[in-house]
Amino acid sequence: MTQRNAIVVGGGIGGLTAASALARQGWRVQLHERQPEIRAVGAGIYIWDNGLFALDAVHAYSEAIEGAHEPPSIDMRGQSGKTLMRIKINGESQPRCLTLLRDQLIKALVNAAKDAGVELVTNSSVVAVRPEGEVHFEHGDHSTTDLVVVADGVHSRLRDSVDLSYSRIRMSQGAARIMIPQSSHELPAEDRGRILESFHGSRRLLYTPCTPELVYLAFTCDSDDPAISGAYINTSEWSRSFPTLSDALRATEGVPATRWDTFEYVRLASWSRGKVAFLGDAAHAQPPYLGQGGGTAMTNAIALANAVSSDMELSEALATWERITRPGIESTQRTSYQQRLLNYVPDRVRNPLVRIAGLTSNVAKSQLKATEIRPTLGSTGGSR
């Protein structure tokens, strides 16, 4: 059988996973990244069961999770620090979720891609793709391939080049992210190791241990909130909102955030056009309230590679991939998007609502449904 060729656009989580998965299915794969090097932008990341499954499938699991934190629970709390809802994780018969550094994840995926034989091309900007499989580069060159996978992020410039209709919602909220040393602050003994998500007004503060040395803080608020000014956090403002975490917040004084990200929701009319397939934030961006942006990108990449490597014609394979995979991912998107509504409920109403929700197993199940997503066509063969 003649070896098929694929070009992947974008060196992020979804693109690297797709490239590795395709190469392990026998494709000759080039991945193009417009930056001078493939690197992470961000801080920490949550990898749930579904993402761990995908990492295993592309043989990146062991390197990615080395030194990762295994929290016992995710606690949702009010301003007073009282726990309103606790989701237990990583115990027997409980969902798995590891927290790790984003740059470690990217390095593991880069190494897995190289090991699989993927050709990584940096400083390579793709300006257009065509349904016939043409890929056009910034300096006028172009290539024709059997499959194009576009994973160039929420700001994708390539969706329009195949005349693909889509909806894109920029939300009023976003987040700034900062890493601080574990040694910079003290928590009560019973809180150590836990993920803490605290609410006050329209602000959320997410406290996530990532490694034995580092904690990841995410400051979620409206884009015009004076508690964030440029690259810096107004420590006193956030301490007033979350006094029980003031010790940790003092450690952010003078530390620039990695960047501000406005949350977005993207829905494509179709995930493919001709020989071009879209995945990750370019196809199904979601706000990060469930911690599933990376996980859904990776599992969708595995599903795509499995589908197009089957005996089906490409058009049938892409249609089957979308038909089987899209409902689960869009369910995750909707649940995450609905979570934004909590931002604008007064504390006196939100706190009892969250407390009652914590007593109802169906609420936790709906939030964790995405962790059960697994590709169902074929197999890339895991490393564990």
Curated annotation (Swiss-Prot):
Keyword annotations from UniProtKB, A to Z: Monooxygenase, NAD, Oxidoreductase, Plasmid
Superkingdom field: Bacteria
Reactions listed under catalytic activity: 2-heptyl-4(1H)-quinolone + NADH + O2 + H(+) = 2-heptyl-3-hydroxy-4(1H)-quinolone + NAD(+) + H2O
Ranges that cross the membrane: none
Matches recorded under InterPro entries: FAD-bd, FAD-dep_Monooxygenase_BioMet, FAD/NAD-bd_sf
Induction of its expression: Up-regulated by PQS.
Record-linked Pfam families: FAD_binding_3
GO molecular function, one term: 2-heptyl-3-hydroxy-4(1H)-quinolone synthase activity
Enzyme class per UniProt: oxidoreductase
Record bears the keyword NAD: yes
Enzyme Commission number, as recorded: 1.14.13.182
Function recorded in the entry: Involved in the degradation of the Pseudomonas aeruginosa quorum sensing signal molecule HHQ (2-heptyl-4-quinolone) to anthranilic acid. Probably catalyzes the hydroxylation of HHQ to PQS (2-heptyl-3-hydroxy-4-quinolone).
Protein name per the record: Probable 2-heptyl-3-hydroxy-4(1H)-quinolone synthase AqdB2
Species for this entry: Rhodococcus erythropolis (Arthrobacter picolinophilus)
Gene designation: aqdB2
